[in-house]
């Protein structure tokens, strides 16, 4: 059995423009995240837990978009969207796995900022390199079995009628729409998993930032306040964008009722947000900008 991804076939006149835009954005994501990883690797001032997590986040972003965009570009180029059941399941599994890991990693990054700002004296002990690695491993090991189980549950459903997916990649809502019979249990599972990987992490991040903001307001130094807010604001912007889009997609009452608006929202969190993330982190982060200037100065001399 195979599916057909409709993608953007409803706007054929814009195919080549969309191909050019998405290709440019994909290259920007690869380049910007690659630069962030390189800067953190080679610059001594960036050898801290915060930037260790940021480099892992950048690597996740590269993998996250690579699951979606190259396949989408190929479908636009060939104007065909045929995809086998196995390829569809694999794409969805890896997409959810990487997305879920990003949610947990963003929570870890918020915890890192909480310890750094609210408990600065304990920070070197609490967030040592071993703990950082354990937190990264935990983010992956929690996500992998849950996502594999959910993917198997969805693709064991019987599919009948049309095999066309009104989307540009294999995601849960449009796949559930093709399933036959009662999908109530699957919908409940989707909501439970979404609560675990979206709602709970978001609430933990909100609590962390509530304590961070409360602590920042107690600082007597205006410079200290500005530096603390600058450090945290970029992370908070990314959190709001990413979790907001995820909530709209996976926590709506009927996630399988996924039409044009769902496709636009998916573009937002699969392409637009990953394009903006490196820009947000670099432009609002003085340490990254200083490291970038030093790297450019070395390359130009």
UniProtKB/Swiss-Prot annotation:
Membrane disposition: Multi-pass membrane protein
Side Cytoplasmic, residues: 38-45, 112-130, 209-228, 284-301
Cystine bridges: 88-180
Any one cellular-component term (Gene Ontology): plasma membrane
Subcellular location: Cell membrane
Annotated GO MF terms: G protein-coupled receptor activity; olfactory receptor activity
Protein name: Olfactory receptor 10AG1
Chain's gene name: OR10AG1
């Amino acid at each position: 059995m195979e599916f057909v991804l409709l993608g953007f076939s409803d706007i054929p006149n814009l195919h080549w423009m969309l191909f050019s835009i998405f290709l440019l954005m994909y290259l920007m994501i690869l380049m910007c995240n690659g630069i962030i990883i390189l800067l953190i690797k080679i610059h001594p001032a960036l050898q801290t837990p915060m930037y260790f997590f940021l480099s892992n986040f950048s690597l996740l972003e590269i993998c996250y978009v690579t699951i979606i965009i190259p396949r989408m570009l190929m479908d636009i180029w060939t104007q065909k969207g045929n995809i086998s059941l196995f390829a569809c399941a694999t794409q969805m599994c890896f997409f959810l796995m990487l997305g879920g890991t990003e949610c947990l990693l963003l929570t870890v990054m918020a915890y890192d900022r909480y310890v750094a700002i609210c408990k600065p004296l304990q920070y070197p002990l609490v967030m040592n390199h071993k703990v950082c690695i354990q937190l990264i491993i935990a983010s992956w090991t929690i996500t992998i079995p849950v996502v594999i189980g959910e993917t198997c549950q969805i693709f064991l459903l019987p599919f009948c009628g049309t095999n066309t997916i009104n989307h540009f990649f294999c995601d849960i809502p449009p796949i559930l729409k093709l399933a036959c019979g009662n999908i109530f249990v699957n919908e409940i599972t989707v909501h439970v998993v979404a609560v675990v990987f979206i709602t709970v992490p978001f609430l933990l991040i909100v609590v962390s930032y509530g304590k961070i903001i409360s602590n920042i307001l107690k600082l007597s130094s205006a410079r200290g306040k500005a530096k603390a807010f600058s450090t945290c604001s970029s992370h908070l912007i990314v959190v709001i964008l990413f979790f907001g889009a995820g909530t709209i997609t996976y926590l709506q009452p009927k996630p399988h009722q996924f039409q044009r608006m769902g496709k636009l929202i998916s573009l937002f969190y699969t392409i637009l947000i990953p394009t903006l993330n490196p820009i947000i982190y670099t432009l609002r982060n003085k340490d990254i900008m200083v490291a970038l200037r030093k790297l450019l100065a070395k390359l130009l001399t």
